[in-house]
């Protein structure tokens, strides 16, 4: 069982590096596994979900040791169930939490400063939306949401509410040679987003499989760059990190240094790639 903690490392840490600080202990309310974390540089806060307690936790940016969160969204009014993922819009001060309930996939939107047992300010979901309840990415610059939907990555307006269809869907397919984009992460100052994908036609995991992919060749995963204007079977403009990943889980960007960081569960590592092309504002195809 993993030790519940948020470990903070130096940006240039390499190899078997030691964390410079850790948020850990009973008061933190952290769970043994957390699949999403957001650093809000505007307000210097760390926001993440606790799936097991159906909560959203917010910590000070420089929190250390056994420190309690400064805000907790939790309770029956929230409607939260198994809150495994989230994204934050620090410009419009909103938190987006995808999940599944009895009616299917839905996105609950909360005020960023919400605390306690509070109702969401709006909900996005319904049969027409096709929302899976797995992931959501906010694009505050262009007022958009990138959401996992049936058949691909759906593009919605940020303020959409209720049973709304996506404006367009990026599907992957034989033309692009990729599956749908996943783990999307917007590139600031551009219309680009970085995401993970797999080779089109790669063998999917069995629904009953309990093991991870064992080799990079088996996983066939890599990182690509798409545009928010793409639709259908659109190819990525650039790709990197072929034949490296086993179980890539999440991405993060460092715009200042033009690098992409990827967490890999199978490798038990965080990998950093120089990827200056992803930060170009041009939309020419590869």
Regions found by a protein language model. Give the residues of each.
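Short loop/turn segments immediately following beta-strands, especially the blade-tip
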Residues: 9-16, 59-66, 109-117, 155-164, ...
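Beta-rich, blade/repeat-based domains predominating
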Residues: 26-43, 76-92, 127-143, 173-191, ...
């Amino acid at each position: 069982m993993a030790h519940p903690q948020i470990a903070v490392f130096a940006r240039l840490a390499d190899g078997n590096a030691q964390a410079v600080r850790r948020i850990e202990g009973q008061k933190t309310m952290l769970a043994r596994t957390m699949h999403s974390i957001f650093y809000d540089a505007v307000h210097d806060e760390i926001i993440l979900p606790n799936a097991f307690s159906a909560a959203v936790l917010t910590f000070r940016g420089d929190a250390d040791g056994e420190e309690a969160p400064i805000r907790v969204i939790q309770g029956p009014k929230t409607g939260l169930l198994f809150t495994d993922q989230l994204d934050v819009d620090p410009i419009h001060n909103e938190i987006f939490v995808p999940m599944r309930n009895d009616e299917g996939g839905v996105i609950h939107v909360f005020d960023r400063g919400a605390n306690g047992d509070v109702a969401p300010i709006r909900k996005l979901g319904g049969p027409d939306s096709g929302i899976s309840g797995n992931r959501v990415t906010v694009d505050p610059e262009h007022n958009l949401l990138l959401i996992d939907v049936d058949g691909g990555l759906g593009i919605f307006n940020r303020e959409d509410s209720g049973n709304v269809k996506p404006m367009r869907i990026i599907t992957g397919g034989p033309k692009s040679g990729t599956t749908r984009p996943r783990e999307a992460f917007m590139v600031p100052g551009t219309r680009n987003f970085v995401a993970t994908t797999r080779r089109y036609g790669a063998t999917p995991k069995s629904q009953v499989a309990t093991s991870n992919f064992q080799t990079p060749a088996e996983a066939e995963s890599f990182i690509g760059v798409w545009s928010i204007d793409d639709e259908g079977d659109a190819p990525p403009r650039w790709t990197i990190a072929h034949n490296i990943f086993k179980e890539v889980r999440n991405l993060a960007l460092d715009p200042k240094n033009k690098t992409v960081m990827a967490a890999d569960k199978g490798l038990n590592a965080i990998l950093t790639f120089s990827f200056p092309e992803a930060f170009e504002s041009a939309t020419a195809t590869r």
